Curated annotation (Swiss-Prot):
Residues annotated as site: Important for catalytic activity: D273
Subunit description: Interacts (via PIP box and GRF-type Zinc finger domain) with pcna; the interaction is required for 3 -5 SSB end resection, assembly of a checkpoint protein complex to SSB sites, and SSB signaling. Interacts with chek1.
E.C. number(s) listed in UniProt: 3.1.11.2
Family to which this protein belongs: Belongs to the DNA repair enzymes AP/ExoA family.
Protein role: Functions as a weak apurinic/apyrimidinic (AP) endodeoxyribonuclease in the DNA base excision repair (BER) pathway of DNA lesions induced by oxidative and alkylating agents. Initiates repair of AP sites in DNA by catalyzing hydrolytic incision of the phosphodiester backbone immediately adjacent to the damage, generating a single-strand break with 5'-deoxyribose phosphate and 3'-hydroxyl ends. Exhibits 3'-5' exonuclease activity on a 3' DNA substrate; nuclease activity is stimulated by interaction with pcna.
Keywords: Chromosome, Cytoplasm, DNA damage, DNA repair, DNA-binding, Endonuclease, Hydrolase, Magnesium, Metal-binding, Mitochondrion, Nuclease, Nucleus, Zinc, Zinc-finger
SUPFAM superfamilies associated with the record: DNase I-like (SSF56219)
Gene Ontology terms describing biological process: base-excision repair
Protein's gene: apex2.L
Name of the featured protein: DNA-(apurinic or apyrimidinic site) endonuclease 2
Organism of origin: Xenopus laevis (African clawed frog)
Alphabetized Pfam families for the sequence: Exo_endo_phos (PF03372), Zn_ribbon_GRF (PF06839)
Length: 517
């Protein structure tokens, strides 16, 4: 069994079709984050993919924001699925359950934590390596980012972490296994960050402190990585970071890079995408956990886990499945109608239509060649005219079929032909359209004058590190320098020890551009 997690940064922005993208990931369960699609914008190609059943969670606060989706192969159809961590928005039928003690959260807070579309749960039946059936719950999450300029988002992020832990541990205590995977938006160790700076400040981050107590010490893998040394802050939680379980000392293993600075070219990033599993599951069923930096299309790369267990498909998709949404279920029902014969319905419809329009109904043995359709404009005639034409038996008067349509003829005779004047002076027109040679000669000194007056921006300076032309940037952040422009090295961002990375050249441009508030 193979599981993949990927922050796709827009499900509708894939370079190829979604099915081709999913197939290329080669996994039984594919969890996507930051789909950036709300329910009203979800189209059928994204919702219903051949060979997969999908489960979405949409943002209810903003359009084109957040959102997660889990795609399961037909051979891995879950037995239950649920949107959100709190159960506020879930349908009790086919839900996962086990919410834990949420008394520390207010009802409004629970609704706020789930209304941004950041979690989808799917529960599967698996056959473990000992051929025993067990339950596996997969929690697909897109954890919030703590914006430094918005202190309330820092609190929101920590509360989301605590709700995630409450739900995951409650499901685990109820039996079975749990996998948490997705964009956690926190790099755990200095090894997971390209520039951890001061280690003391690094460890003081509240998100890292939560991960310390939530995750347990990884046991050295059987591949000989026994030299693993964990910091004293390592916790004794119920879950393992599966990647560090198998690759505890691997450096430069990043999953997210800044697209604006081109940091992916120099691998100057962070590892914030995880596949976390409960201890027993990782120790007994996991074979490996890897990152996939070769897969492009987002500012994140996928992460993948290989497991020994085999999935057991459910007979029917749970109610949360996207194909059951009315906007997509209705389309499938219409397609089914073309494949099912409905003789009685068609018969009644024919009788009703013949009574309403006054046209003769087709009976067995009738000469079809003698029946003619009435013109469409007769359907809009007044009730008085219909009463004269329709007989007591509901059949139309034969004279109505041969009656000349005076109205159409009158309209045709009243239309006057449109006279289009023909230009007979082609030579004169062509002569006027020809460019005037004296004018071109007259404009040459004007062009030289304007070029001398409007010289344009000066060429950019060369950076001191590489002697290459710099690029011009503009300060977007609010403050006294907002709108100011500056020159920096054109190379991608990277570590200071990397000669191929951007040097530290910086030069303000004297002229200040405008900045919107």
């Amino acid at each position: 069994m193979k599981i993949v997690s990927w922050n796709i940064n827009g499900i509708r922005a894939t370079r190829v079709g979604l099915k081709e993208t999913l197939d290329s990931l080669d996994a039984d369960i594919i969890c996507l984050q930051e789909t950036k699609v709300t329910r009203d914008l979800l189209d059928e190609p994204s919702a219903i993919v051949e060979g997969y059943n999908s489960y979405f969670s949409f943002s209810r606060v903003r359009s084109g924001y957040s959102g997660v989706a889990t795609f399961c192969k037909s051979s891995t159809t879950p037995q239950a699925a649920e949107e959100g961590l709190s159960g506020v928005f879930c349908n009790r039928t086919g839900s996962v359950g086990c919410y834990g003690n949420t008394e520390q959260f207010l009802e409004e807070e629970l609704q706020s934590l789930d209304q941004e579309g950041r979690a989808v749960l799917t529960q599967h039946r698996i056959l473990n390596c000992e051929d025993k059936e067990e339950t596996l719950t997969v929690i697909n999450v897109y954890c919030p980012r703590a914006d430094p300029e918005k202190p309330e988002r820092k609190t929101y992020k920590l509360r989301f972490y605590h709700l995630l832990q409450t739900r995951a541990e409650a499901i685990l205590q109820n039996g079975g296994h749990v996998i948490i995977l997705g964009d956690v938006n926190t790099s755990h160790r200095p090894l997971d960050h390209c520039d951890p700076t001061d280690l003391e400040t690094f460890e003081e981050n509240p998100g890292r402190q939560w991960l310390n107590q939530f995750l347990g010490d990884p046991i050295p893998s059987q591949k000989g990585d026994s030299e693993t040394v964990m910091p004293p802050s390592a916790g004794s939680g119920l879950f393992y970071d599966s990647f560090r379980y198998f690759h505890p000392t691997q450096k430069n293993a990043f999953t997210c890079w800044c697209s604006a600075s081109g940091a992916r070219q120099t691998n100057y990033g962070t590892r914030i995408d995880y596949i976390l599993g409960n201890r027993e599951l990782v120790e007994s069923e996991f074979l490996d956990s890897v990152i996939m930096p070769e897969v492009e299309g987002s500012d994140h790369c996928p992460v993948k886990a290989f497991m020994k267990c085999q999935p057991i498909a459910a007979n029917k998709c749970p109610p949360l499945c996207t194909k059951y949404l009315p906007e997509f279920a209705g389309r499938q029902q219409k397609l089914l109608q073309f494949l099912v014969k409905k003789e009685n319905t068609l018969g009644n419809t024919t009788e009703e239509s013949s009574e309403l329009t006054g046209t003769p109904s087709f009976t067995e043995g009738a000469d079809i060649s003698t029946v003619r359709k009435r013109p469409s404009d007769k359907l809009n005639s007044t009730s008085k005219k219909k009463s004269k034409i329709v007989t007591k038996n509901g059949q139309g008067n034969l004279l109505s079929f041969f009656k000349p349509e005076r109205q159409k003829l009158t309209m045709a005779t009243e239309c006057n032909p449109i006279e289009v004047p023909i230009c007979k002076k082609e030579k004169t027109v062509q002569k006027d359209l020809q460019p005037a040679t004296p004018a071109v000669k007259y404009n040459k000194p004007q062009t030289a004058f304007w070029k001398s007056l409007l010289k344009g921006p000066p060429p950019p300076p060369n950076c001191k590190g590489h002697s290459e032309p710099c690029v011009l940037r503009t300060v977007k952040k609010a403050g006294p320098n907002c709108g100011r422009q500056f020159y920096v090295c054109a190379r991608p961002e990277g570590h200071s020890s990397n000669p191929q990375a951007r040097c530290n050249f910086f030069l303000w441009l004297t002229k200040k551009a405008g900045c919107e508030d």
